[in-house]
Amino acid sequence: MGKSVGNLSLVEKVGQMFLVGIDGTVADEAVMELVQTYKIGGFVISDNNVESVEQLLRLINSLKAMNAGNEVPLIVAMSQEGGRANVLPSQIRKLPAIKYIAESGDKNLLAEVSSLTGKILRSFGINMNFAPVLDLGGAVEGRMLSDRCISTNPTIVSSYSSQIISAYKEEGIIPVPKYFPGHATTKNKGSSIVIPYTSKSIQKLEQVDLVPFKAAIENGIETMLVGHINLARLNLFAPATMSYKVITKLLKEKYEYKGVVIADDLCSACVDIQYGIKGSARRAILAGCDMMVIKDFRKVRGVLEDITKQIKKGNLDPKEIDLRVQKILDLKEKFNLKDEEITEFEIMRLNEEIEEVIEKIRR
């Protein structure tokens, strides 16, 4: 029998809906308060949190130790794609970007690289990876995604991403495909302060850009990261993360997606400037998001308190909150998340395995 949302207080329910960043390389008393008082859903490890293998292990172990008194385990997430999208310590050999592996056409090699990535993450106690990127390449070449995309062909992206997702799952890692509904045909994609948008109709997007996302849904994907992308023909005035028409009507109802919807970092300048962090969180929940990423640790407590207040005032439906938090609890249960301490890490062995895979890619 899994964990029940009925056993959580309102504060704890709200806490479960957020994946947050931390400042620096050590979990301090402020982090402990977030864990023990607000029962935060999990943490996102970024490159500014990583110095070395030893330090990263200490950090993750300390986060889990802080959560030892809570019944619900932590998500510990990372965006580890390979290539330049690499967060792991420099002591770990870097795997190539996914595009170059996919170009080999060798699905077995792709699965091997993905399995190894999952194995490395699991060795650190990380249990969620914001990957793979399902956006199509081509239109984003030389831009912010470039070699992070698998292919320009939606059929290839669908097929290869399925291999990646399966490999992560086999290693006990929660895969989080991104960035629904896709950047490929958007404008302003190179700007950090203007929301990327596309004026394509949904019908045209469904023929190309949305194909990999729909395939992942049909294959039963448990999570999906939504990007700050404006579908102008569907909702002119809001990014996908804050659009009821995109999240609820399109993703949940039309595509019958039953998994956990995660909003990309609400601290991103393109939304924070326009809506503010609290306004962004409210809008994301109203749109249908189940979880939200907030990488700026300093802003987390204010958002948690504001969302709790909005529920008490009736501005957010408590029954709907319960349904979403239960999905989060079920996700953690399905992947058997535990706050276990990692006591051993074999750098040499992992690097040898990475070198073997790199040699196969070079052939």
Residue ranges and their predicted role:
Residues 33-46, 115-128:
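Catalytic domains of carbohydrate-active enzymes, especially glycoside hydrolases
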Residues 54-65, 107-123:
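Active-site-adjacent structural elements in enzyme catalytic domains
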Residues 21, 27, 49-68, 74-76, ...:
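Second-shell residues forming the walls of enzyme active-site clefts
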Residues 92-105, 149-151:
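A charged helix-plus-loop insertion that forms the helical arch/lid used to bind
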Residues 1-38, 254, 273-363:
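Preference for extracellular/luminal or secreted protein segments
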Residues 88-93, 127-147, 178-195, 227:
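Active-site-proximal loop/short-helix segments
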